[in-house]
């Protein structure tokens, strides 16, 4: 007799959606099939759709050091409420930044105390820390992150071209990928300075200071350096259809490049930024309707590999001011990635459920060598999200689990109601309640087993 059976759900697998039970033993899936034998504990999933737990490969929980912005305790609860079971925390916005072994150890300890979801940690590439990349790899980072433009934090300076190239060569030797924030510093900084010197500091001026060409140029440059270095490349938060096209062109030229976008680029346009204001400020910024539609075409066409949240919260006071350039740029959305893909993707555009599972779980697990995560298969961790596809969620500030109710998604309705989230067979979220206090574990990838980009079932 199994420990647990999730009974009678519509199970989303790579090959399609099947009616099946899912048996769980010792935190792992032990069987999948119709009418499995009884278990010590049964969860009724009849009428529900069972997805693999969301793996958010790009977010900022600010732990340790800036927990007044968020923290893993509240952040991981918001993740779980959105169907998430694992996350990859970026190396900046915490204090200290994760650019050496000691910082990694401190962040790992903080997350083990506070997180209810499993986690992996990105290390950083900044000028002067090349010798720290090997110790970070030994500690267990999932990969390395670099900025081509100003990060907004002086303690995490952007990587100049030589720093990036040498970092990529070292990452390739270590068998780990490099993630890049792709915006041209030359273009964005000079346009920003020109606007501010002229006293133009509105939201429209901010949008104009970060044009699509700044993203496209930086993607091409990062791809060239990665190709020369023999490094796997991960372009984070691509905001535009032209940006995806640039990454795809690099792939055809031999760059092993993964293409990530974020839920907010698939739900909002620049018109929403002008309407909502700083709550919707991010970098790269939201784009016009043409780029929005092009980006969706790449998602629907199977070109985009992964959709993340880039959850980057801040206290309300940091999201106000007369100078739009000075306001903190980051969107809080960790609770909404699956909701966006269900509403804007499946219900509005016909995006297949198995494609949603691939974008949110299958690809990040495969790409980052988390071989027991990302899909509902025998032997994998029982990381499951149960969704009532006939339900509807009206996202209001009081339904948010993040620390501050500063969120552009509030006031919107999403078809598909997340009813339960399970991590390794344990329910961590159930019917609007968090059911555990901790339990998240560090995910350590196996170096040199990362999947090649562009490979989808």
Swiss-Prot record:
Binds 2 Zn(2+) ions per subunit. It is an enzyme of class 3 (hydrolase). Zn(2+) 2 binds at residues 145, 181, 237. GO terms for cellular component: cytoplasm. Carboxylation allows a single lysine to coordinate two zinc ions. Its cofactor is Zn(2+). Its EC number is 3.5.2.5. It comes from the Bacteria. It catalyses: (S)-allantoin + H2O = allantoate + H(+). GO terms for biological process: allantoin catabolic process; purine nucleobase catabolic process. Pathway: Nitrogen metabolism; (S)-allantoin degradation; allantoate from (S)-allantoin: step 1/1. One of its GO terms (molecular function) is zinc ion binding. Keywords: Hydrolase, Metal-binding, Purine metabolism, Zinc. The modification N6-carboxylysine is found at residue 145. Zn(2+) 1 binds at residues 58, 60, 145, 310. Catalyzes the conversion of allantoin (5-ureidohydantoin) to allantoic acid by hydrolytic cleavage of the five-member hydantoin ring. Homotetramer. Belongs to the metallo-dependent hydrolases superfamily. Allantoinase family. This is Allantoinase. The gene is allB.
């Amino acid at each position: 007799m199994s420990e647990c059976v999730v009974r009678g759900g519509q199970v989303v697998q790579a090959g399609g959606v099947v009616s099946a039970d899912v048996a769980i033993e010792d935190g792992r899936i032990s069987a999948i099939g119709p009418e499995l034998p009884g278990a010590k504990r049964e969860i009724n999933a009849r009428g529900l759709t069972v997805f693999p737990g969301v793996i958010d490969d790009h977010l900022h929980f600010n732990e340790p050091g800036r927990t007044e912005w968020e923290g893993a305790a509240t952040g991981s609860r918001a993740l779980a409420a959105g169907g998430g079971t694992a996350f990859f925390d970026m190396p900046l916005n915490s204090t200290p930044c994760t650019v050496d072994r000691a910082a990694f150890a401190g962040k790992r300890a903080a997350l083990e105390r506070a997180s209810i979801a499993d986690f992996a940690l990105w290390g950083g590439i900044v000028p002067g820390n090349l010798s720290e990349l090997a110790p970070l790899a030994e500690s267990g980072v999932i990969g390395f992150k670099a900025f081509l433009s100003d990060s907004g934090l002086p303690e995490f300076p952007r990587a100049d071209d030589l720093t990036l190239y040498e970092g990529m060569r070292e990452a390739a030797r270590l068998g780990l990928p490099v993630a890049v924030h792709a915006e041209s510093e030359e273009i964005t900084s000079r346009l920003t300075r020109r606007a501010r010197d002229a006293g133009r500091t509105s939201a429209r001026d901010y949008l104009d200071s970060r044009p699509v060409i700044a993203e496209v140029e930086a993607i091409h440059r990062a791809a060239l350096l990665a190709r020369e270095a023999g490094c796997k490349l991960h372009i984070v938060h691509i905001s535009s259809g032209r940006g995806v096209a640039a990454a795809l062109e690099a792939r055809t030229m031999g760059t092993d490049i993964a293409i990530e976008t974020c839920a907010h680029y698939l739900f909002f346009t620049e018109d929403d930024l002008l309407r909502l204001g700083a709550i919707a400020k991010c970098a790269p910024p939201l784009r016009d309707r043409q780029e929005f539609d092009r980006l969706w075409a790449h998602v629907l066409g199977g070109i985009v590999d992964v959709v993340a949240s880039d959850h980057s919260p801040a206290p309300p006071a940091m999201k106000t001011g007369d100078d739009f350039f000075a306001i903190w740029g980051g969107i809080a959305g960790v609770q909404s990635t699956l909701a966006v893909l269900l509403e804007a993707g499946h219900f509005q555009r016909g995006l297949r459920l198995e494609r949603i599972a691939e974008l949110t779980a299958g690809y990040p697990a495969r790409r980052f060598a988390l071989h027991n995560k990302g899909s509902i298969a025998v032997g994998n961790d029982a990381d499951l999200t149960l969704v009532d596809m006939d339900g509807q969620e009206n996202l209001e500030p009081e339904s948010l689990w993040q620390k501050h109710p500063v969120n552009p998604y509030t006031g919107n309705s999403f078809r598909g109601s997340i009813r339960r989230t399970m991590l390794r067979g344990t329910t961590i979220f159930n019917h609007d309640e968090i059911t555990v206090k901790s339990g998240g574990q560090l995910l350590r990838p196996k170096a040199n087993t990362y999947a090649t980009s562009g490979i989808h079932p």
